[in-house]
Design a protein with these regions (language model features):
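A short, N-terminal "cap"/entry segment at the start of jelly-roll beta-barrel domains
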Residues: 1-44, 126-128
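Conserved short histidine dyad/triad with adjacent acidic residue
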Residues: 33, 48-62
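Conserved GNAT-family N-acetyltransferase fold
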Residues: 50, 69, 93
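Short beta-strand His + acidic residue motifs that chelate non-heme Fe in jelly-roll/DSBH
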Residues: 58-60, 78-79, 95, 101-107
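Glycine- and acidic-residue-biased ligand/ion/polar-headgroup-sensing regions
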Residues: 65-76, 81
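Short acidic-glycine-tyrosine-enriched beta hairpin
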Residues: 83-97
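Ligand-binding loop in jelly-roll beta-barrel domains
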Residues: 97-123
């Protein structure tokens, strides 16, 4: 069995702990987003520890699975329906399934966030 997301680590039988800094480092949104980091897929959930480079915007995109984004370091801004929302460490963004959105990091340093999606689809979405 292979991971739904190209390059992601697939959790196997008996695997219970993952060093997210050492699992396969992949692009979080090839062709539309500059984020990258470690990604692990289970049977029903996908988790990733991502780094969003400072000064880099994403293009508008969507994905058929819902997503949670928990900011650990730096600041992240996300746009939904023309309105921008900002969150720093401890803030959590919710992205409904199929919701077109975009993000940016206008801070002076990278943003690090933990993200979780249901595994009905892979980590990657599609450019809007």
């Amino acid at each position: 069995m292979e991971a739904r997301t190209p390059g992601a680590k697939l959790a196997g039988p008996g695997e219970h702990v993952f060093d997210m800094h050492k699992v396969n480092q992949i692009m979080g949104g090839p062709g539309y987003s500059p984020v990258f980091g470690g990604c692990v897929e289970g049977e029903r959930m996908i988790v990733a520890l991502m780094r969003y480079p400072a000064g880099k915007p994403s293009d508008a995109h969507s994905h058929p699975n819902e997503q949670w984004i928990y900011v650990l370091e730096g600041e992240l801004e996300m746009e939904f329906d023309g309105k921008w929302y900002r969150g720093g460490p401890g803030h959590c963004f919710y992205v409904p399934a199929n919701k077109v959105h975009k993000a940016r990091n206008e801070g002076a340093r990278d943003c690090v966030f933990f993200t979780c999606k249901d595994a009905s689809h892979g980590l990657h979405g599609k450019k809007a």
